[in-house]
């Protein structure tokens, strides 16, 4: 349960585990149910295109997302994969929505074991492929 009293629906955890363990999805979009009492799955996708993911982010509302981010380091070490947690809260979203999503984030984030990187986005430049690549690859290759 979060500070806002919002709970994480079981379906949200099931979908996350399907992405993490079964590689069933490329990304999952989460949002609040209509009563604003539970974090539920809004959509899942197997589309490998990062642009397809970005197209799903609403211009005027908040959501959470999990993305199985694949990338290569220096081109010769093979592909790597990191699970990225997004909090999408555009400046144009209603203030109430931003407040509820901000205060409910920790409940979802704590429930999702195995996330390697968190990205907070208020505009599309903050969630661009290059911006996220920079975040997930920090320290990679230096081990």
Curated annotation (Swiss-Prot):
Keyword Protein biosynthesis listed: no
Any one GO biological process: Golgi to plasma membrane protein transport
Residue(s) carrying Phosphoserine: 4
GO molecular function, one term: actin filament binding
Swiss-Prot/TrEMBL keywords: Actin-binding, Cytoplasm, Cytoskeleton, Nucleus, Phosphoprotein
UniProt xrefs under SUPFAM superfamilies: Actin depolymerizing proteins
Location within or outside the cell: Cytoplasm; Cytoplasm, Cytoskeleton; Nucleus matrix
Record's GO cellular component terms: actin cortical patch; actin cytoskeleton; cytoplasm; nuclear matrix; plasma membrane
Post-translational modification summary for this protein: The N-terminus is blocked.
Ranges of residues in domain ADF-H: 5-137
Subunit structure: Interacts with actin and AIP1 in a ternary complex.
Note from the entry: Present with 19600 molecules/cell in log phase SD medium.
Task of the protein: Controls reversibly actin polymerization and depolymerization in a pH-sensitive manner. It has the ability to bind G- and F-actin in a 1:1 ratio of cofilin to actin. Binding to F-actin is regulated by tropomyosin. It is the major component of intranuclear and cytoplasmic actin rods. Required for accumulation of actin at the cell division site via depolymerizing actin at the cell ends. In association with myosin II has a role in the assembly of the contractile ring via severing actin filaments. Involved in the maintenance of the contractile ring once formed.
Family the entry assigns: Belongs to the actin-binding proteins ADF family.
Protein name: Cofilin
Encoding gene, per UniProt annotation: COF1
């Amino acid at each position: 349960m979060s500070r806002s009293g919002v709970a994480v629906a079981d379906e949200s955890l099931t979908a996350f585990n399907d992405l993490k363990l079964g590689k069933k999805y490329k990304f999952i979009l989460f949002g609040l149910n209509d009563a604003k009492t539970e974090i539920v799955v809004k959509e899942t996708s197997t589309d490998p295109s990062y642009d397809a993911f970005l197209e799903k982010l609403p211009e005027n509302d908040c959501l959470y997302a999990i993305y199985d981010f694949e990338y290569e380091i220096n081109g010769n070490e093979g592909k790597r994969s990191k699970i990225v947690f997004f909090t999408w809260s555009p400046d144009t979203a209603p203030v109430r929505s931003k407040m509820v999503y901000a205060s409910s984030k920790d409940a979802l984030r704590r429930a999702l074991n195995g996330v390697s990187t968190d990205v907070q986005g208020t505009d599309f430049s903050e969630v661009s492929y290059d911006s996220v690549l920079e975040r997930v690859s920090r320290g990679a290759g230096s081990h």
